[in-house]
From Swiss-Prot:
InterPro entries: aa-tRNA-synth_II, aa-tRNA-synth_II/BPL/LPL, Anticodon-bd, Anticodon-bd_dom_sf, His-tRNA-ligase, HisRS-like_core, HisRS/HisZ, HisZ. Transmembrane segments: none annotated. The lineage of its organism: Archaea, Thermoproteota, Thermoprotei, Thermoproteales, Thermoproteaceae. It catalyses: tRNA(His) + L-histidine + ATP = L-histidyl-tRNA(His) + AMP + diphosphate + H(+). GO terms for biological process: histidyl-tRNA aminoacylation; L-histidine biosynthetic process. Belongs to the class-II aminoacyl-tRNA synthetase family. Keywords: Aminoacyl-tRNA synthetase, ATP-binding, Cytoplasm, Ligase, Nucleotide-binding, Protein biosynthesis. Its main location: cytoplasm. It comes from the Archaea. NCBIfam families: hisS (TIGR00442). This is Histidine--tRNA ligase. Its EC number is 6.1.1.21. The gene is hisS.
Length: 417
């Protein structure tokens, strides 16, 4: 038999297989991030991978809708694979309105986007994130940003910057310039500020109907600044919003390293459901964008009919793993027991049980390799100790142990295990 053709032996485009070293790295990252969320009182939640298409598309924006994996099920219903967890969480909250608020949930799970695959970007990938539902306080914004930063640091990020903005501040700026009606095209342009030259970003705005002088002023207003400078800038736009920012900056100053934070009015986030504070993280020498979040105070009302403030963030786990260099975790076998014949098998099983009960991983030779081949095998798979159960050793009540890391060999009585 010739087997499958080569292209069918590989996963579908944009997907990946997780072999043990990569999977253990993923598990390590999951443990680091989950520990942070749990320490802040967030509890883990999971939802179906498949959602009603209407639920996914309700407030996603056309660009994201175009990336949804969607199909008809066998009953003819339009369904799709979730592209993030914020929308499913909003749906879950919509029929659990009696939950005590604020709700603090987190997740570490797979999501799907039918996007063009790139280095470090897959169509099936993992997201870690939190959702805080039921609070409009700037303390909630500060808490979510604090969890975000502590998660980055727990993951191993040392060189990073978190850029913060507020969609309300951008809207106030557009209103003062008389171009609020061009909001959507301006947001699209600002979202591409660090991907395209200045002229092209301005062209996107002018091609959408924004006068050239206004487009230039919007671009200039989106320059980075410190949080303290941002308070003054936002106060000039709107006193109420400026007061909110004064409180937020004060709370952040007590909780996080503020030198890692910058205010940047070009950070608007690509999803249409954001309504207030938004933020993104850039990690490492090449400033990889690894995640972000913000406020979505109108989203839950779309599903439940009840106005409910909410905010959260999501981190692209694979991108973060690449940025911090956590891409492989080798997990060697603790013990490999080699026996020469079936007579020693009961002794091998008994010893393996003792070692496993003590928390060790143990494999027993299956009887298909001679000692030389078994030795080559365990070196390839990674093993700490080789235990040899020969007939003469068993007669003396001992086993021979090879420490493969120190390259030492010694005997040990079976009674001492």
């Amino acid at each position: 038999m010739s087997g499958l053709p080569e292209h069918l032996r590989r996963p579908p485009r944009g997907m990946r297989d997780w072999l043990p070293p990569q999977l253990y790295a993923l598990i390590e990252m999951e443990e680091r991030l989950s520990k942070v969320a749990e320490s802040f009182g967030y509890r883990r939640v999971e939802t179906p991978v498949v959602e009603h298409f209407e639920v996914l598309a309700k407030k996603a924006g056309q660009e994201v809708v175009n990336e949804i994996y969607y199909f008809k099920d066998k009953a003819g219903r339009d369904v799709g694979l979730r592209f993030d967890m914020t929308v499913p969480v909003a749906r879950v909250i919509s029929y659990n309105l009696d939950l005590p608020r604020p709700v603090r949930w987190y997740y570490f799970t797979k999501v799907f986007r039918y996007d063009e695959p790139q280095h470090g970007r897959y169509r099936e990938f993992h997201q870690f994130g939190i959702e805080l539902v039921g609070s409009a306080s700037p303390r909630a914004d500060a808490e979510v940003i604090q969890v975000f930063i502590e998660a980055l640091e727990a993951a191993g990020a040392r060189d990073y910057v978190v850029k913060i903005n507020d969609r309300r501040a951008v809207d106030k700026l557009l209103e003062s310039l008389g171009v609020l009606q061009h909001r959507d095209v301006i947001y699209r342009a600002l979202d591409k500020k660090y991907k395209l030259p200045r002229e092209q970003v301005v062209d996107i705005m002018t091609n959408g109907g924004v006068p050239i002088d206004k487009a230039e002023r919007i671009y200039d207003a989106s320059e980075e600044m410190t949080l303290e400078e941002a308070v003054d800038a936002v106060l000039r736009l709107d006193a109420g919003l400026g007061s909110f920012y004064q409180k937020l900056v004060g709370y952040l100053a007590t909780a996080v390293p503020v030198d890692r934070l910058r205010f940047d009015m070009s950070i608007v986030r690509g999803l249409d459901y954001y309504t207030g504070v938004v933020f993104e993280a850039y990690v490492g020498k090449y400033r990889l964008a690894v995640g972000g979040g913000g406020r979505y105070d109108d989203l839950l009302e779309l599903y439940s009919g009840v106005k409910m403030p909410a905010l959260g963030f999501a981190i692209g786990v694979e991108r973060l793993m690449e940025a911090v260099g956590l891409e492989r975790v080798e997990k060697p076998l603790d013990y490999y027991i080699y026996i020469f014949d079936d007579g020693a098998y009961p002794h091998a099983v008994a010893l393996a049980k003792k070692l496993r009960a003590a928390g060790h991983s143990v494999a027993i030779e299956l009887g298909e390799k001679n000692l030389k081949d078994a030795f080559e095998y365990i070196l390839k798979v990674g093993t700490k100790y080789l235990i040899i159960m020969g007939r003469r050793e068993l007669e003396r009540g001992v086993v021979k142990i090879r420490d493969l890391q120190r390259r030492e060999e010694f005997e040990k009585p079976l009674a001492e295990f």
